[in-house]
Curated annotation (Swiss-Prot):
Location in or out of the cell: Cytoplasm
Main localization of the protein described in the UniProt heading: cytoplasm
Signal peptide: none
PANTHER family: EXODEOXYRIBONUCLEASE 7 LARGE SUBUNIT
GO molecular-function terms, A-Z: exodeoxyribonuclease VII activity; nucleic acid binding
UniProt keyword annotation of Cytoplasm present: yes
Recorded superkingdom: Bacteria
GO biological process: DNA catabolic process
EC numbers on record: 3.1.11.6
Identification of the protein by name: Exodeoxyribonuclease 7 large subunit
Length: 417
């Protein structure tokens, strides 16, 4: 095919043949040049009589992989054999095999990632996540006292799974588990654990999630220090317990999880309460409550007995009789005082009456004197006559004497000598 046709656009009327597509892709890929690529070996396919070997290199955080092709001598002549799960750095050139339409990296060098370098990366990640606050105790969620259902992420048929289930059932036989088995090492561990965590976190029946593995080498535990897993655990709404069981070099998951357990067995003990211990505690609390109640009753009985010994309760009528005598005495005093007061006031009234009688008009009238009043013709009130001008002849008079009054008329007046 001419370059002119190769550079033309494909159309329904002039489509490209497969060979042209593969040729164009091959030319574009081969322009990428050599690359250093890091990943985790997942499949190693080596045959003694093969000149070429085929491997799969997986991303450590995402479900992605790339095929590797390399001379068998590179693998055969290594001092330490390669195995699935090894973290490596490969040097190769992207290659596209036009005949089969497949992509691969043609590798000429494979180097294992050193433990020291991996640990340095883990510590760098640990510092970065700590600076973001993912290790902050304030953000850690409290575990439920008695979970309704426990989510368990662990390897299929592993000792960690057996330990968690057996210990939990021994402690609380009614506890329920939702178990999801995943890879716990190797390239597929991180994506599988993240997916299992997502499923359990969305299950409303699950109250707490345990991620368990029974220890292992530093290389085996690398998935539990991958950043993607830490982000997923930090974002989970359900409390997460890390039970990896590796004391010397703790994975980053131990710092991000809401609770770190030393071993899977320890995780079961921390998550599930012991029914025997709880019953014992209930019995102790019941005994303490009963003892406290008995003590209170005894104190109240003693106080009641002390009250009963008081004189007022020994003879309740004594204070009443005492008060009755006091009241009778007070009544006698009041009567005496009132009688004396009445007599004193009566004597005073008699004295005043005598004075009034002696000084009043009645006594004067009794001695022959009278009071003369003129009665006005206009009907107004009578006036006492003190001068002759007040009673001209013909005036109507009222003369008051000791035993009544006399109506008279003025016949005339006479001036005093």
């Amino acid at each position: 095919m001419s370059s002119e046709k190769a550079s033309s656009k494909s159309t329904p009327e002039a489509p490209w043949p497969v060979r042209e597509v593969n040729t164009q892709v091959k030319q574009w890929i081969e322009r990428l040049g050599h690359l250093w690529v890091e990943g985790q070996l997942a499949q190693i396919n080596v045959k003694p009589n093969w000149k070429l070997s085929y491997l799969t290199l997986r991303d450590v955080e995402q479900e992605m992989s790339v095929q590797l092709t390399c001379p068998t001598d590179i693998i055969r002549n290594r001092p330490t054999p390669l195995k699935d799960g090894d973290r490596v750095i490969v040097y190769g050139k992207p290659a596209f095999y036009a005949g089969r339409g497949t992509f691969s990296l043609w590798v000429t060098d494979i180097r294992p990632v050193g433990i020291g370098e991996l640990l340095a990366r883990i510590e760098e990640l640990r510092k970065r996540l700590a600076a973001e606050g993912l290790f902050d105790p304030a953000r850690k969620k409290r575990l439920p006292f008695l979970p309704n259902r426990v989510g368990l992420i662990t390897g299929r048929g592993s000792a960690a799974e057996r330990d968690v289930l057996s210990v939990a059932k021994d402690r609380w036989p009614e506890v329920q588990f939702e178990v999801i088995n995943t890879a716990v090492q190797g390239a597929s561990a991180v994506p599988e654990i993240i997916e299992a965590l997502r499923v359990l976190d969305q299950d409303p029946r699950v109250d707490v999630i345990i991620i368990a593995r029974g220890g292992g080498s530093v290389e085996d535990l690398l998935p539990f220090s991958e950043e993607a897993l830490q982000r997923a655990v930090a974002a989970a709404q359900t409390p997460v317990v890390s039970a990896i069981g590796h004391e010397p070099d703790t994975p980053v998951l131990d710092n991000v999880a809401d609770l770190r357990a030393a071993t899977p067995t320890d995780a079961a003990k921390r998550v599930v309460p012991d029914v025997a211990e709880e019953r014992m505690l209930i019995n102790q609390l019941r005994s303490r409550s009963a003892a406290a109640l008995r003590g209170w009753v005894q104190r109240e009985q003693q106080a009641l007995a002390a009250i009963r010994t008081r004189p007022v309760l020994a003879d309740p009528m004594t204070p009443i009789n005492r008060r009755r005598d006091e009241i009778a005495q007070a009544v006698g005093l009041i009567r005496r005082d009132v009688t004396h007061l009445v007599r004193t006031e009566q004597a005073l009234v008699a004295s005043l009456r005598a004075q009034v009688s002696a000084l009043g008009p009645s006594a004067t009238l009794a001695r022959g004197y009278s009071v003369v009043q003129v009665i006005p013709r206009d009907g107004s009130a009578p006036e006492v006559v003190t001068t002759i001008e007040q009673s001209p002849p013909g005036s109507q008079l009222r003369i008051r004497v000791a035993d009544g009054s006399i109506t008279a008329a003025s016949m005339g007046t006479q001036q005093a000598n």
